[in-house]
Amino acid sequence: MKGQETRGFQSEVKQLLHLMIHSLYSNKEIFLRELISNASDAADKLRFRALSTPELYAGDGDLRVRVSTDKEKRTLTISDNGIGMSRDEVIDNLGTIAKSGTKSFLESMGSDQVKDSQLIGQFGVGFYSAFIVADKVTVRTRAAGANADQGVYWESAGEGDYTIADITKDDRGTEITLHLREGEDEFLDDWRVRSVISKYSDHIALPVEIESQTESEEEGGESTVSWEKINKAQALWTRSKSEVSDDEYNEFYKHISHDFTDPLSWSHNRVEGKQEYTSLLYIPAHAPWDMWNRDHKHGLKLYVQRVFIMDDAEQFMPNYLRFVRGLIDSNDLPLNVSREILQDSRVTQNLRNALTKRVLQMLDKLAKDDAEKYQTFWQQFGLVLKEGPAEDGSNREAIAKLLRFATTQSDSSAQTVSLEDYVSRMVEGQDKIYYITADSYAAAKSSPHLELFRKKGIEVLLLSERIDEWMMSYLTEFDGKSFQSVSKADDTLDKLADEENDAQKEAQKALEPFVERVKTLLGERVKDVRFTYRLTDTPAIVVTDADEMSTQMAKLFAAAGQQAPEVKYIFELNPEHALIKRAADVSDEAEFGEWVELLLDQALLAERGTLDDPNLFIRRMNQLLSA
């Protein structure tokens, strides 16, 4: 070979190469993705330059990438008939770590040309990923438009230097041969290579072909070599929505999600302007088995100009939308040099915000257009969506529109009522959205806190899932109306009761000494004792003050193993109930104490579902019943 010389890399050489090869990439098979991406770039460069210089094609305009293996020599070769490189370009692009010929090419192009390009290899470490699986890499290349004797040979063992020489190469383009390390024979296997290409390069517009040998049927005959196209899947998301059928969208969803059922809905959009990207987002019909596994990553597939970069790119979707499947394809995304971890930047955040709004709009449309499908969605993913009000304050109102509830108006635990439905049915003079949280639907439905609301025909949301209390601590209002827990102390609730008549006033006045006796007996165990007119069938209830931690929130703390502050209840008494009147007539202090304790335990049991000493409660009840 003529002009042979050995040169040192123009960077931090051996140390940097070693760091990159062994640490930069988390998945060694992506070397093939990187090399095919580089080949795709080379084809794009030739296509652009041939627009003004068609003779660069030299009669070979069918651009492609070819992959072949040699099991005897233990080599894997990736070749293309793209733009190729001159000697200076080889030194410049392959002799410098983190130097990208693609990036330089982009900078030399006009903005309109950049917009239409499909260049993907914008980071100069991609080529060197070959050393993850190879202990020696050789490159044979010839620039388009150059003579056959102007080919270039490059070789390196990834040890800090490389050899370069002049060669004769009959055709343009680049041929990269990897001499595989011991233990990397899997990349000599035809099926393994095919699967990697299908996984990472399925949607490159450039054909990716693999060598296929057919044995001769004649004895002693030579086998024939042909090239089989591997990347059969189309870049569906680059096509116009009007050109894609529902069946194609459904099949593509199954392809990228490995799901067997059709999605409930999808949204396909191309955005142009300051940021340009295409998104294709799907709402699955059922929850994945690992949706609640916090260690499992959830997110969109990330493509850069149709080349797969990573699964589960979490940066583009908030956690409460982790059920969304799909992809985003852009050339403007900020990536670190390995393309493995997206940089935390304004561009990424803007994309996240836009995609989040897109999903919320898609769900809103699904709810309006197909209530049955939306109910399927809610049954599968409602619990996840309920994380939204706490996680995403900027979209809280939009998320609230998507929530569904069981209510006192329906005799079913099915969560089918929207907040818009609730507001449309509010009675005259009602200015709050009332709700109750409990351990179960049955407990919520039968709570004594609902007695006044049933009497007045006021609908109450029945919340019975563990996340509900936490969600409601962030969901403070909807459509200008505040939320009010019916288990919290609220002066306006008594105003909902009938105006006190003279008889009620007299009854309350007569029982005022009773209230004082109860206060004296219970002391610091309760925050206050007072009458209420929101009860009809129940003698007493306990409520928490407006600024006090609720019973359900205290249970959440306890379930999480955290120490919650002790809840001090307000003990509210129904002055018109027979048991209250009977207790008030008891003069014996010991018996009076038993009555008060029984009434308090009943109220606590209704509120909390448990008592500190249920056996004492039973003995006390039996004693009073047998008296």
Swiss-Prot record:
Location of the region described as C in the Swiss-Prot/TrEMBL record:
556-627
Which family does the entry's similarity section mention?
Belongs to the heat shock protein 90 family.
Major subcellular location class: cytoplasm
Quaternary arrangement and interactors, per the entry?
Answer: Homodimer.
Q: Which GO terms describe its cellular component?
A: cytoplasm
Q: Which UniProt keywords apply?
A: ATP-binding, Chaperone, Cytoplasm, Nucleotide-binding, Stress response
NCBIfam families, from UniProt? PRK05218.1
Q: Where in the cell is it found?
A: Cytoplasm
What is the source species? Pectobacterium atrosepticum (strain SCRI 1043 / ATCC BAA-672)
Q: Which GO terms describe its molecular function?
A: ATP binding; ATP hydrolysis activity; ATP-dependent protein folding chaperone; unfolded protein binding
Which SMART domains does UniProt cross-reference here?
HATPase_c
Question: Which CDD domains does this UniProt record tie to the protein?
Answer: HATPase_Hsp90-like (cd16927)
- The region called A is annotated at 1-339
- Which InterPro entries does this UniProt record tie to the protein? HATPase_C_sf, Heat_shock_protein_90_CS, HSP90_C, Hsp90_fam, Hsp90_N, Ribosomal_Su5_D2-typ_SF
Q: Where does the chain cross the membrane?
A: none
The job of this chain, per UniProt, is described as: Molecular chaperone. Has ATPase activity.
Classification via Gene3D superfamilies? 3.30.230.80, 3.40.50.11260, Heat shock protein 90, C-terminal domain, Histidine kinase-like ATPase, C-terminal domain
What's the protein here called? Chaperone protein HtpG
Task: Give the span(s) annotated as B.
Answer: 340-555
